[in-house]
Each structure stands twice: as structure tokens, then as C-alpha cells.
Amino acid sequence: MNYRKLSSAFVTFGLLCPLSTEAIHAQELDKNEVKVEIAQPGLTIGKLTQPQNDTKENIAKKYLKGEVNGAKAQQEQVTSEKNVDFQPTNKETKENQTELRLAQTYKNYKVYGQDLIVKVDKNGVITTVSGKVAQNLDQQPNLTITNFLSKNEVKSKLRNILQIPSDATETEFSSETVVYKKKDGHYTYATVLTFTYENNEQVINGNAIMDLQTGEVLFQEKFIKNKENKTINQVTAPKLSPAKEPGTGKNALQENVLFNIAKGTDGKFYLADLSRGNGIYIYNADYADSLGGDSQAGYPGTLISSNTSNFADKEAAGVMKNMSNIYDYFKKEHNLKSYDNKDSKVVASVHGFDSTEVSDGVKENYVNAFWHPSWNQMVFGDGLNGKLTSALDVTAHEFGHAVFSGTTKNKIVRYPSAETSALNEGLADFWGTQIEYYVKKDKGNWIMGDTLGGLTIRDIPREIGDGGNKLYTNLQDFYNDGNDQESHVNSGIISHVLYQLAEGKTYNGIAVQKQGNEKVSKVVMRALQNYATSAEDFESLQSHIVQAAKDLYGNTTSTEFEKAFQAHGYKALAKISKVVEVQQGK
């Protein structure tokens, strides 16, 4: 296909003559007119094609490849590069339309973390496209190279870099070649690796991403499990059923807590709530090192049990109580079943550890928690005498990460950009505050970790981040040379927007009307469930949240949302911009 530029706003694929005023007017009167209603960064809405007689998957793929005659699209959402294709990865029916999620490929390799959402109505008309296409891949010099490292060379380099013992035998090794965007913005071929090695003393497993041309490891994580207590590690929980009585315990704040538990066929009680979806399970990780080092049990560890319905483990009791409230919030307020709307099992490990974050080597001093997307679980350390596990907002923050992974169908081991990572952190903080307000009512606040006894994780209203450092809240700060684009530091660029909206504050001279927590949270959830993609960036999320506000509450509300984004350095959203009109060459 050839291109010929008609104007700054329209581009044609093939041959297309400029339309006269009369022709435009005639089209507007045509009920079958193909037209764009919304064209904003990462989002196009309207009647974007004529009815198509094909499978929904083919309709979506042809649109993204610029092959649907007469279609309207944004330039950032289509490509004519012959080596680019799109692979359907998920299909759902939503609001009487078929919603498809498609992963972009180049020369049959997935572009890492790059996907789009296309909605097709019953007549084969595309109504919504969300996300962006990676452009100009043919111009990337590293993607013309075909002399990749061999599989044996990859394995050899991996063993050397990760310092795998020479006597360790490979028991698992899988790889997927992808097109990967490096920090410098250039694309290269890389391989995403999952591995397990084992000798008489240890089992070593993890993930890595390696440049297939240079052998550079672009990302790595490894986990080492000692075998000295192998008989303990092999113990499995008996068959469980819901216990008749509730579980009791005290959290790290010495508060009495109640929660559902299970009873095993061995007569013991277990920290497993079988009443919520496919269950909430709390494990003892026994200070396994999450990034390599000594470990007795590994993750998730051993399912926590007790001879009575009372559980003495204060960290476990605190997390179980919090998880119950968090699950209920998402189901009752957003009809979200578990973190992925598939009612997946919720797994959390207490007594976690990361040797890289504890300077004194005392495992009980690990003051952190995390969601691990590859393991599909959360991990909590014992730091601050266990108070971390009792902090509802901290627990909800980690569950918020799971929600981001689950709603965007994101199973990648590393987020594709610093923007995606920052948004993920900011939204996790947002869910932390929302659940605290849901449970504690008027005692909720926008301070992450306010119950930790002097250690504030992030104070969103005062723009204070980790360690008392500045929390960036303006999008333009993200691009400053002095900003290393660390995700937690930049999380305020979205969380402070949502704070302003919920509370009705004036920021940088721009006032917005108070929307309240319930309204803002429903808008954010709609954006995540209907528009957000795995490679979400700041300007795309702005488009998606503003559109979600319009979907639910109309133009007046969406205008307030847009004002809040502008107060934080985001550009004003044009209703229609960068439109492409497609016509197949003959």
C-alpha cells in the first residue's frame, strides 16, 4: 500500500481524493456514515467502519493493519508495516459487543507488553479502539539482524550471570523470543526466560529477559530454596472444608480480629477462607529470600494451621482479616470477583524476606510487601514488629497491583515502561485509600501507612513520598532530567489527580468540584476494565479515565475529571485529532 498526504488531519492508504464541502455534508446525512466521535491519545470511539462480514478477530486485525476500506482511525493505532500482525489473546462479551484484546507481533514475535483493545458490534462495526501500536519497527536497526544467540549460548550466559553452581542440573527451561523496547527507546530481539536448576543442596528458579544479540540481561530475578528441610517442604495440606466457627486472633496492633477459616481432614484449622471465590489462603514463607539466598520453605510456603480456631500468628491474622475486607470491597462496590474478575485464588505469604533490602541481615526487619505477577501472590515482611501486615491500606495497595495485572490481562514479568510502572504504583495507592475509607468510614485518609507508627510511606495530599522525599505530582516533572522515573516517586502523577477529584481541591490554580470516593473509584474501575492496556501510559490513562467518567456520569462530570488532569500538567484533550482515513489500494 502507498501513502499520499492530503492534510495535517487526514492521511489515505492507497488512492483517495479530497472530499468537497457538498460531499462532506452528504456523508453527514448518511445514516451509514463512518465517523469518529472521540479521538484522543490511546482511544478512538465512533462508527469506525462499515459493517464487516468476517470473524470478529479478522475484523479487528484488518483494522489495525489498515486493511478495512473506508475505516477511520488514529495514526497511532494503525500500521501498514508488512511484518506487523496482531494476535488475539482474549475475547469477551461486554455491553452487547465483542471485546477483543490483541497482542502486536513483528515478524511473528510478540512486541513485549504491547496490546490493544478492539470492540466490535453485532453487525461487524468497530466502535472502540484502545491502546497504541508500536510504530516504525522496520526502521529499527536491531530488528534487521537475524544472527541471534543460540539456545545453548543463552543458557551458558544465563548460568554465568546468575552464578548457577556448576553441579546444578537444569530441570526446567522455557523461552519466548519477543521484540523488546529498551530503556533508550530502541527495540531489540530478546528472549523471556523461565528457569529451574537443582543440585543436592538447592533449587534455583526465576525469570530473566536477555538481549538475543548482545547477551545483556535486561531483567532478572532468581529464587533459591535450600533442601535441608526437604521433608518439611513436601508436606501438603489435607482436604479442607469451611469451619463452622470463625477464626480468631490478634493483629500486630493487638486488635481482636475475626475471619473465616477452614478445617482439614487432619482435624487442624487452616488460614483458608473458602467462602470468598476460590478462596483466600495465607502461607508462612519462613523468611524465604525472594531475590536469592537462603530459604527453608520457598514461596508461597506452608499453609498456616492451628490446633484450635485461634491463630497466634499476629502477622497472618492481620493479613487474613484485611484480605477479607479487600475482597468484599471489590465485589460489592465494583462487582469485581477477586483481582481478575475470574474469582482466582487469593494467595498471600507472611514472614517474607528480601536480602537486598535488609542491611542488618535480620530477617524480621524486612519492611516491605509486594505483589509478584509470575507467582500470582502477595508477600509481606515482618518489619516494624509486624505492623505492616496490620495496615489495611498497605495490604490493599498490594491487592491493587493484582487488580492492575488482572484487569489488563497482564501476565508479563516486567512492565514495559517507566510510565506503566508509575501508574501501577499510583493506582495501587488509590485503591489503598479507597478500601481504608470503605472499612474505616470517616477515619480513612490519603496517607499510605498512617498506622505504622511514624513511618509514612506516601502522604498524597502533602506530596511527600518514600523516606520524606518529594512525591512528583506534575506530569512535566516526569520528563525532567533530574527525575530518574522511579515508579514510587512518580506515582503521585496519577494518585494526586484522583485525590483532587475525590476531595474537590484547588491545585495549581485550577479548582474542581468534589466528586467523592465512590464516584471516582467507579470511574477508575471502568477505565481499567474497558480501556486500559498492558502498556498504559500517562496520556492514555487520562483519555481512558475521562471517557469512563463520561460513560458513567456524562459530560459535566467528565469535564471536572479533565480539569484535574490539566491541573497536574497533562495536556487538554482535543475531541478529535490525528484522524486517518483508510482506503485499500487496488
Residue ranges and their predicted role:
Residues 313-316, 320-396, 404-586:
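Zinc-dependent metallohydrolase catalytic domains
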Residues 46-53, 104-107, 137-148, 180, ...:
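Second-shell loop/turn segments in exported
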Residues 8, 17-36:
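Sec-dependent signal peptide cleavage junction
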Residues 4-14:
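Sec-dependent N-terminal signal peptides
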Residues 12-13, 24, 432:
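Cleavable N-terminal signal peptides
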Residues 27-231, 342-370, 580-586:
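Segments that shape or occlude catalytic/ligand-binding pockets
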Residues 155, 190, 194-196, 216-333, ...:
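Acidic/polar low-complexity interaction segments
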Residues 399:
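Active-site neighborhood of glycoside hydrolase catalytic domains
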